[in-house]
Every structure is written in C-alpha cells, then in structure tokens.
C-alpha cells in the first residue's frame, strides 16, 4: 500500500514538471522547434509545454510565451491561428538550443550560412532573419549583431519578423 501511494505521489509531482519549455531545445528545420510542430492544437502545446505561459496582449495573433521563470525573457513563443500552431520561435537568446550540424545559439553569422545552407536574408527591426522555405514551412535563423540569437518555424512565404 505504501508503495502504491508513493508511486501515485511521484507521478503527480513528476507530470507537471515534465511539461515545460525544454532547457536545451532543438530545431529540426522545416519540422519542429523544441518539440512543437506547426499545425498542432493548443491542447497538444499545453500537454508538451505545460499551462504556465503568458499571453501577449498587443499581438495580432494569439501568442503564448513559455518562459523558464515568470516574467523572464528566455523561452519559447507559440502563435496560434484557429487553435493551431501557426508559428513557433525562441524568445530572447536561450542558451543550449541547437540545430543540426552543431549549430548552437550564439554561433557567428558565417557558421549559420555555412551549416544551414543557402538562406534568404530579410531585415527586421533590430535583427535579421535568415530563412529557408520548404513547400509548407519556413525555417528562420535570427541574427543580432552578427550572432545567432534564435530560431523560428512558421508557414512558408510568411513574414518571419516578430
């Protein structure tokens, strides 16, 4: 009986802890960012990242901010259109996040262009978005002052500036 109660308590405590933005998330270009895929439902996002998120009040789209601690900047932003993920991107410059071929947040611009392949550069307010489109998905590598600041996924042929 004690073992069953202990197991129940551990499961109760561990479940919410597992649902949070990843500390060292991964970009799979054209597919996922931090385990989130375009088209997922809001319920799937909450199951993966938890219920602790801020809501952007001034954004055109419904936007949730999953940060590591309340009112901090680093984490993951998720935009929803009709309760489905239409964009997902890192917030601020979360350490430990990576993309294939050893590309990590903080890499210099030349590493991004070498490792991510041919990219289209768009100028945003205060940063640049180096992008690559597939048929359905655009992958963005956000550059600030010559360094990789973050990653993003959104529908192909949309504005990557956020």
For every predicted segment, state its role:
Residues 20-27:
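Cleaved targeting-peptide boundary
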Residues 88-90:
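Functional surface patches built around histidine and acidic residues
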Residues 29-36, 96-103:
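Second-shell loop/turn segments in exported
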Residues 26, 92-93:
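Short, 15-30-residue, compositionally biased linear elements
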Residues 14-15:
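N-terminal signal peptide c-region/cleavage motif recognized by signal peptidases
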Residues 21, 40-84, 93, 103-162:
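A cross-family detector of function-defining hotspots
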Residues 1-4:
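Positively charged n-region of N-terminal signal peptides that target proteins for export
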């Amino acid at each position: 009986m004690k073992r069953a109660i202990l197991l129940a308590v551990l499961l109760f405590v561990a479940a919410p802890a597992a649902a949070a933005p990843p500390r060292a998330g991964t970009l799979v270009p054209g597919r996922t960012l931090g385990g989130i895929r375009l088209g997922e439902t809001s319920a799937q996002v909450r199951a993966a990242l938890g219920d602790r998120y801020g809501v952007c009040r001034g954004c055109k789209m419904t936007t949730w901010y999953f940060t590591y601690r309340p009112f901090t900047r680093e984490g993951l932003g998720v935009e929803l259109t009709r309760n489905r993920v239409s964009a997902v991107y890192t917030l601020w410059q979360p350490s430990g996040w990576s993309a294939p071929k050893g590309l990590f947040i903080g890499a210099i611009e030349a590493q991004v262009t070498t490792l991510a392949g041919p990219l289209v550069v768009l100028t945003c307010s205060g940063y640049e978005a180096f992008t690559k489109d597939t048929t359905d998905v655009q992958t963005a590598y956000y550059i600030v002052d010559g360094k990789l600041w973050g990653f993003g996924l959104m529908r192909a042929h949309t504005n990557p500036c956020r």
